[in-house]
């Protein structure tokens, strides 16, 4: 057992209040692509460009094909040992003592049996749908129907055939190659009429994915509840930063607020700064590698075996 793990496991049982901050790195261990690097393309479109209100306004059929593909992938994926470790941890504490803040929209945390009272999906869920009409407040939670309409059924065929078309290419400078299996350029995007897309059963306007797109605000009610958890007494003893760098808002703000109140930070990620790994950052532990494998080991004093 290395020094950092020993110190962390000695501190963990003393904690009265814990936050787990979860990013895309944990879901990557379940086989889901991230929006970054060589996994950032879908049909030669930058995924980030499709995850915007403007993209949906310009071509809702294109955006719905992308999200139908993501929904199908998330349904095929299974929670990994990291998800189950956090699930067990959530049942060791009350919801005023422990929360998981996930930036993922794949639903894997909830499917792992996590205590829903202590789970905050701040970027929404692929399996929530909401009406686009300003005058309508219809929301459909936990809709796992796939495909949502007949026009979107081809996404299943594409996902199931990725392995047969997998190859990579890179540029002459040796930069990361692009995995064509995540960018199926040989199947051009279909043009889908709005009448063939998911529609609101109340007002018959278009439905959209219930996720927070780039440029949109995070849900105020969730952020308010999280802020209350962070600021209330007793102070947070520990924040687990899992599968994310924790350097982007609001993740970075939670880390810094915990530090300011005397709490400690434990990072589980494939990319961690050397000064953290070497124990040179005060009150911070770094565990480099696959968070799905590291979490069950690190949390064992509280959760036992997975």
Swiss-Prot record:
As to how many cofactors bind and how, the note says: Binds 1 zinc ion per subunit.
> By its UniProt entry, which SUPFAM superfamilies does this protein fall under?
DHS-like NAD/FAD-binding domain (SSF52467)
One GO CC annotation: nucleus
The entry marks the following residues as binding substrate, namely: 67, 70
What is the recorded name of this protein? NAD-dependent protein deacylase
Which GO molecular function terms does the record list?
histone deacetylase activity, NAD-dependent; NAD+ binding; protein-glutaryllysine deglutarylase activity; protein-malonyllysine demalonylase activity; protein-succinyllysine desuccinylase activity; zinc ion binding
Q: Which UniProt keywords apply?
A: Metal-binding, Mitochondrion, NAD, Transferase, Zinc
């Amino acid at each position: 057992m290395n020094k950092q793990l020993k110190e962390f496991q000695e501190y963990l049982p003393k904690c009265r209040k814990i936050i787990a901050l979860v990013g895309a790195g944990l879901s990557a261990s379940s086989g889901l692509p991230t929006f970054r690097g060589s996994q950032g393309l879908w049909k030669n479109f930058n995924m980030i460009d499709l995850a915007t209100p403007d993209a949906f306004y310009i071509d809702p059929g294109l955006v719905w094909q992308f999200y139908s593909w993501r929904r199908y992938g998330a349904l095929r994926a299974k929670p990994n040992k990291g998800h189950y470790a956090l699930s067990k941890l959530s049942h060791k504490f009350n919801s005023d003592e422990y929360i998981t803040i996930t930036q993922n929209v794949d639903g894997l945390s909830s499917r792992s049996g996590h205590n829903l009272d202590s789970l905050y999906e701040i970027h929404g869920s692929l399996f929530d749908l909401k009406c686009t009409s300003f005058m309508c407040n219809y929301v459909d939670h936990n809709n796992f129907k796939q495909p949502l309409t007949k026009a979107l059924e081809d996404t299943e065929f594409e996902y199931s055939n990725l392995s047969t078309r997998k190859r990579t290419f890179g540029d002459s400078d040796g930069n990361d190659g692009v995995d064509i299996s995540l960018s199926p350029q040989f199947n051009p995007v279909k043009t889908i009429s709005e009448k063939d897309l998911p529609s609101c059963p109340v007002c018959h306007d278009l439905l959209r994915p219930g996720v927070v797109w780039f440029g949109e605000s995070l849900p105020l009610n969730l952020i308010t509840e999280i802020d209350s958890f962070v600021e209330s007494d007793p102070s947070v003893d520990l924040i687990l930063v899992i599968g994310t760098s924790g350097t982007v808002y609001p993740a970075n703000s939670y880390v810094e607020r915990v530090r300011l109140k005397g709490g400690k930070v434990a990072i589980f990620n494939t990319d961690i700064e050397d000064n953290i790994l070497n124990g040179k950052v005060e009150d911070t532990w770094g565990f480099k590698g696959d968070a799905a494998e590291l979490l069950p080991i690190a949390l064992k004093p509280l959760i036992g075996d997975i």
